[in-house]
Amino acid sequence: MKISKIIIYDEPTVPEIQINRIEKFLKDTFHTDVEVRRSFFENVNDEIFQKVASTRIFELKKPFSKHIPTELEIQIERKNTDNSQNEEKVLYDGFELQKTISKFIPTDEQNQNVLHIILTNKLTCTFDESDFRYHARALIGTNPSIISTTGIIEAPAKPKEYYLELMTDFSKEKTDEINKKYKGEFLEYNDPRLSEVLEGYILQAIMYYETGEAFCENKECRLYNAHWQKELLYSQLKNKKFCSKHEESFRKIINQS
């Protein structure tokens, strides 16, 4: 295993994250040094808020273009740091955000043996040139890796029937009724299942760092790249296993520790 230490940054505005359980899970799985830190965006100066605000997305159908953030945008960054949900639905270019965060990682920790995993409520997106638009992403896999709790909820799609029923009436009453009807079939904000699902994304981040491959196309694998909430809940909560290929890969990684 190339990694000698994993530093995971909590997102305290999302109380469903059982950070101590995640720490134990990582230690039991990889037998490596694991350190938990508070939110990466907590107790930071305005320079970080300004840099992060500059990674915001304004045009969903155009590649990323940097801009100079306004004071209002910087204030929104401060506000979102205190809220469990990305209430303003601000979108961030995931790769630009990753580059920004990497500049504020302590110099003595910027080496190939220390993997930083940032948990955040910020909604990360990447531009897809196949359809020329941005898509929400739960994981930006590199070092530091970013795992978006909002992305886990928003990126994998809800059942098709959910959207079809919602199209007939967008009122709050109808939305609440539909959400109640399909409750349990997808992750919601303040969902107690979120922490366990997070473990799977952390495994994907580690796999990407170790092998350059984060996802699997096999639905029976915990590394499966789920496009639907149903698939996500199955791979991370019901199945919770690796396919034979990735089971072997993880054993090799662990044996190299």
Language-model features: where?
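Metalloprotease/metallohydrolase-associated module, dominated by Zn2+-dependent proteases
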Residues: I6-T13, H135-R193, E210-S257
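N-terminal low-structure segments adjacent to metalloprotease catalytic domains
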Residues: M1-R137, F250-S257
